[in-house]
Every structure is written in C-alpha cells, then in structure tokens.
From Swiss-Prot:
Record protein name field: Phosphoglycerate kinase
An example Gene Ontology CC term for this record: cytosol
Swiss-Prot/TrEMBL keywords: ATP-binding, Cytoplasm, Glycolysis, Kinase, Nucleotide-binding, Transferase
Assembly and binders: Monomer.
Species of origin: Leuconostoc citreum (strain KM20)
Length: 405
C-alpha cells in the first residue's frame, strides 16, 4: 500500500504539526552543519505556500539533566531556519503550556513556529523521566491537540524510534502523512530492498562486526555481492586464519564470521590487502600488506590497499543498484581515507551509467561531500540507524504510523 504524503493533504488555514529532524551538530550556539535543516525545506515551504500554519517539532542531542538544556536549545536552529526560508520563524522556548498554546493560536496562514527541543520533556524538575523518548501517551496526546488533526512526519532519521513527537502524535490524529524527505527515503531504500535493479551490490564498512552483522546477513540474502571493509573486515581475516597484527577485531565474533563466509561463498567480497601502520596516527609509518601474507605484529590495518580498491572497482563496474554504509578505513585521517574516497568516485561512475546509488551513515556521507559528488549520486540518506534498520527489512515505527492512502 502507498503511504499518504504531504501533497495529498488539504492544508489551507490548518494548524499543521510537523516532525522534522533538526538534530544538527551545535557548539556554543553555533551550528556546525545545517544539512538536515536544508533537507526539510521542501516540505516546510510546501506547507507555507499552501497557506498552512507550520508547527515544527524536533529533538536535539540527548537531555539527561537540567544543565543539558542550556546547551541544547533549538533557538539557534530556528534562527538558521528563518535565514534559509527568508521569513521569521516564531520560536517558543517551551514544550507545553500557555505561552506555546497562545503562540500557536495566533499563527496566521503561511507562518511557521518552532517548539523547543522535544527532549526537554525527558527531564522534568531535574528528574530524568523520558516522556519524549519513552513515548509518554499523555505527552503525545497533548502535542497532537495543538494542531488541526493533521501530522506530517518528515524525520526519517528518527523513524526507527517510537517517540512522543512522532508515533505519539501520529496515534492521536486522523491524517498522518510523509513529508517529501520521508517519501524519498521510503522510495529509494524501499526499492533497494524490495525491487532492486540487478546487479545489486551492497558495501558495508565501519569498525565493528557487532554493529553491522544483521545488515550484512540481511543483504547477503538480497544482494548479488556484499563488500565488507573497514575495521570489521579484520574479524573475517582472523576467521580465515590470517595474521592481523594489532588490527581492531572482535574475538567473540570470529565463529559468526566463519559461518557467514561459509554461507555466502563468493557473494561476500573481502579486502585482499591493507594499508598497515605502526601507530594509530596519520603520521605513522605505513606499508601495503597482502591479506595472505598477513599484517606483522606491531602494525594495524587502517585502510584497504590498492589491490582491494581495484577489486571493488571491478565488483562495481556493472552494478545497477549500490547501497553504501560505512567507511573502508580510518577516514578522518587523510592517509587512510583513500579506500573510502575511491568508493565515492566509483559510485559517481555507476550513477552516470544509469545505476541507482544510495549512501547512508555519517562517514560515507562525509566522504561524498568531501569529494564534492553528493549531487552526482541518486540518494544520500539522512538516517544512520534508521536506514540500516530499514535495509534489514525491519518495520520502523515512524513509517508504520503514517496513514495509507
């Protein structure tokens, strides 16, 4: 069944509740990266242009004490949103109460209001109660009552969580629609899982097998090839009996890696060489080491080597759908970023050849942005954990709560 979207709604004159994902990096009131704010603009603008009255909810960081609230107000985010929209965003420094209700009731058509950080509700009078993050039913009902029975969920990044500001509001209104960003995420990730154009190649990187094991299992059942890189690859190398020196690995996951390799056969593509370093430092002494020769003691693998890059390029050469989540090495150090950046470059070629390319996860997204190729790929997912769980085939509460057409 197709989900209800923002373009299916009658918005004029309505108080429209919207969950957005404005969980941006912020330090001393300065926003480090406003990508998530920019990503929500199409939906917000659509509501305003159609004479709706937009009431925005978002979380920011984690609130565990009253002190956290001083650092994590959404006031700077509201100011930045106003600059991007070119109009005043009314900010209310509360999550409930008379001031908030009056401000919402005073809104005119085409105006926008931002509610304070929804996670301020997780700490009340200094006590951690988690009203927002544990989906307190009274809170969801209260927030739902601030609007006109309409709710737009455009926060894919929190779709894997059942919070008061997404699932709680949704369960108390009659029409719940996906915003344009949510709609795009569902389309690209949903098609990749359910109906990929083949060959379908998945690339999974990152430090730990334990973080990504479910996604690797799930993708081995769906994809034609699954490339595994990053720190997690050394657990597979250890499972093959190869020397990994001082490389990161999880001893308790070696048996699991053996089972996966036995089941997957040649579907699973592992690095064949590494850039090994004598210290966890960009200035470390390095050498290229074949996996079969092994990494010597005192050295650790910090990136995939040139033969592995060539193997990845060959594996991706005829791909028609590619999903990438996680770096191939210690991407934040320039000397160990080559493998990760090479994937970004290869994905541009796949896209130019008519393929669909989907990137998720902070490091992978940072890599394509560093290369300046984000706009040359099909889709950059805004959800880290949410995109992984969706690709695993799990039902996400935030998506499940959106109305069917």
């Amino acid at each position: 069944m197709a989900k209800l979207t923002v373009s299916d709604l009658e918005l004029s004159g309505k108080k429209v509740l919207m969950r957005v994902d404005f969980n941006v990096p912020i330090k001393a009131g300065v926003i480090g990266n406003d990508n998530r704010i920019v990503a929500a603009l199409p939906t917000i603008k659509y509501v305003l242009e159609n004479n709706g009255r937009a009431i925005l909810f978002s979380h920011l960081g984690r609130i565990k004490s009253e002190d956290d609230k001083k650092e994590l107000s959404l006031a700077p985010v509201a100011a930045r949103l106003g600059e991007l929209l070119g109009k005043n965003v009314k900010f209310v420094p509360h999550t409930r109460g008379e001031e908030l209700e009056s401000a919402i009731n005073a809104l005119q058509d085409g105006e926008v209001l931002m509610v304070e950080n929804t996670r301020f509700e997780d700490v009340v009078d200094g006590v951690e109660v988690k009203n927002e993050s544990k989906n307190n039913p009274e809170l969801g009902k209260y927030w739902a009552g601030l609007g006109d029975d309409l709710f737009i969920n455009d926060a894919f990044g929190t779709a894997h969580r059942a919070h008061a500001s997404n699932v709680g509001i949704a369960s108390n209104v009659s029409q719940v629609a996906a915003g344009f960003l949510m709609e795009k995420e569902i389309k690209f990730l949903g098609d990749a899982v359910a109906n990929p154009v083949r060959p379908f190649v998945a690339i999974i990187g990152g430090a730990k097998v334990s973080d990504k094991i479910e996604i690797v299992k799930s993708l081995l059942a769906k994809a034609d090839k699954v490339i595994v890189g990053g720190g997690m690859a050394y657990t597979f190398d250890a499972a093959k009996g190869e020397k990994i020196g001082n490389s990161l690995f999880e001893a308790d996951k070696v048996e699991l890696a053996k089972e996966l390799m036995a089941e997957a056969g040649d579907k699973l593509v592992l690095p064949v060489d590494s850039i090994a370093a004598d210290a966890f430092s960009n200035d470390a002494k390095t050498e290229v080491v074949d996996a079969t020769a092994g990494i010597p003691d005192g050295y650790m693998g910090l990136d995939i080597g040139p033969k592995s890059v060539k193997l990845l390029q060959d594996t991706l050469a005829d791909a028609k759908t590619v999903v990438w989540n996680g770096p191939m090495g210690v991407f934040e150090m320039p000397n160990f970023a080559k493998g990760t950046l090479a994937i970004g470059e290869e994905l541009v070629k796949v896209t130019e050849n008519g393929g669909t390319t989907i990137v998720g996860g902070g490091d992978s997204t940072a890599a394509v942005q560093q290369l300046g190729v984000a706009d040359k790929l099909s889709h950059i997912s805004t959800g880290g954990g949410a995109s992984l769980e969706y690709l695993e085939g799990k039902e996400l509460p935030g998506i499940a709560s959106i109305s069917e057409k």
